[in-house]
Amino acid sequence: ANDSSVRSLLNESSEARMNQAKQTAEFLKKQISEKGMIDVGTGVERELGISKEKMNQALYILEMEGYHIYGGGVPQVTNPGKQTNIKVLCPPGTEHKEIYNFENVHSVRDYVSHDDGETFDKFVYPKSMDSSRLKIRYAEDGGIQKDGVIEIRRGVDDLSLGDSHYAQVRILVDGNRYLKGMAVYSDDLPDGVDVMFNTNKKKGTPTSDVLKKVKDDPDNPFGSLIKAGGQSYYIDADGKRQLSLINKRAEEGDWGEWADKLPSQFLSKQSLSLVNKQLNLAASDKMAEFDEICSLTNPTVKKSLLKSFADDCDSAAVHLQAAALPRQKYQVILPITSMKDNEVYAPNYKNGETVALVRYPHGGTFEIPILKVNNKLAEGKSVLGNTPADAIGINKKNADRLSGADFDGDTVMVIPCNSTKSKVKITSTSPLKGLEGFDTKDAYGGTVKKDADGVDHYYRNGKEYKIMRNTQTEMGKVSNLITDMTLKGATQDELARAVRHSMVVIDAEKHKLDYKQSEIDNGIASLKKKYQGNVDSEGHYHEGASTLISRAKSETQVLKRKGSPTINEDGSLSYKSVKEEYVDKNGKIQVRTQKSTKMAETKDARTLSSGTPQEEAYADYANSMKSLANQARREMMSTGKIAYSASAKATYSEEVKSLNAKLDLALANAPRERQAQTMANATVAAKRKDNPDMTKAEVKKASQQALAQARSSVGAKRSNIEITDKEWEAIQAGAISENKLTQILNNTNTDTIRQRATPRASTALSTAKQNRIAALSASGYSTSEIAEALGVSSSTVSKYLNGKE
């Protein structure tokens, strides 16, 4: 072909390409005329079936015609401090700030959930039970022994717990009140009574005051999230489908899945030998994981895992969670009134062994009951069954010792210990005298009066007091105070004062207590001065967290950071800070900052320590995590990549095609997720406008619910890429570019990929794994438990423990 014919063909194809861009621009214009502002961020081109280049050309055409393209961030409603980036196409004349009216930002496609919403069970307004079916068991009749327990008649269709022996539930009563607590079956309810509610309130208290008042929110009448699938249906006598009265917040099996690390709040108050054992085990676990990642054969997979591993190590330095003790698990507590004071019904543990119970927030060793397991008790079997997934039964005396635990869904950490064969020794001391008989509601409860506008006001001793709105913040302060006092050797009387106040703080928002008076009565100000007061290098006096344990997660403000951090030669991270000024609501010029933690910002954890042995142990651990994070990043920087092979792409063309299709499907969720985030933001903003006094906890619940509903309505659902053996062959042969493989790794199950990329040749265990065996053994793990943790046989573990390998 001559030059002119080639030019002619090129012109035709470029004209066709330009036509496609023009058509896309016209389509987007039509969308704007119908909807207003539209999201044109990552993934929208896939929905339109065009390339990224075509999309960019179409947007350029529209910009030339006076349309605006603005970037911004949608705050992630359930992830404070994080945002989802958006790119919005706007009609001419639109100001940048208008994109932050999220209810006005629409999607190009009108999303509908393809599975008709089956992925998320939509919340239905609850069905109400008539109060004639309910009886209250007051304190004097034994209700105080089971406070918070809802006993329901077995075999009643509209009150079935399904496959569960127990569940944390909400039941609407008479349309305007509700019951909240732990539901269990009962076989001895009076005739005509289907539900018995146990309360610590005294006889004569009206039913309406025993029950909770329904919230004025049709999406969340209980002020608490009902779990996915927490509502169910049954077929009535007429063959009609009816909504059950039971609304589950959590059910049997949900509590046992919680993380089983050891928080510093508990471990730092135990013996130094136990602190060192569990921190060393946590460190050796991480070292073994690092060694395993370094042995991976695929460099792209290796880099991806090293990056997330380094982030995990940085996080571990801040959160200071040690390795779990053998068979340690969270369990929900239920009352067994016939249980002895030194016993526990715990079928997940061996009959006759001893266990420690730890509740969070944890005050100290005086709150830890050490109990003997008795799994032969008839009442235990009747209430919980023989095989409860994640519950134990204790009596009220032990619940009270656990800093006043309730039976309405409170959990404890159960740790087998202190028996003759156990290597685990948990320190438990006598209950503090100053806590005996202390009841937060009796001591600091008040009376409520409504004003002319229907607003509640709370009074105690004739004086009005304010209700707590920031439980988490206040709880954090008093927990840090107790930790600092314990490490610095406070007296039992001083600890009792702080713990009494912490008990009031825990209950203050829920039970409307006068927590400010508790602060005064317990002399909290003088305790803070004595145990947390310090003078800085410039001579300024401060109070606040004063030991490494409490300082690690303490908030600190840093200059606003832009973009991703760069990795220094030593593996540490450098951030680009910007000095942005703004005028606050008082007209003062302020510099924009963002939140970080003191541990994240220091290079040496010892700068946060006051010098106690426990703090020094934690400082060693934190520094080892920081060092390992840097080492992982250095390894990441020096790892190469698989060369892209065109011949491999041809050989594995079907696999490449399949992987591309799977990736397209996974990435197509991005616009839906952005739309869900903008919708949820708009919903929560409207709720906050209608209810300016919403607490942080209420906002969090509303956010979770709004996001779940928004994801359901637009069909946003993460789709994990499943990689076949043949597709993995294609990846290893270089048939997929590094950029595309990274995208695939971001949308697949990391553990499966790690297994595929781990070499199988050697049977000898790495030094890190051998060290981990030794550390697990020192912490009391059995041979079979160590074998399970490492994925090897018990005989292999025995050989290493006996020095035969």
Where are these regions (language model features)?
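Beta-strand-enriched accessory nucleic-acid recognition/scaffold domains that flank the catalytic cores
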Residues: N2-L384, A391-G404, P416-E805
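A short beta-strand element within the Helicase C-terminal
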Residues: D410-V414
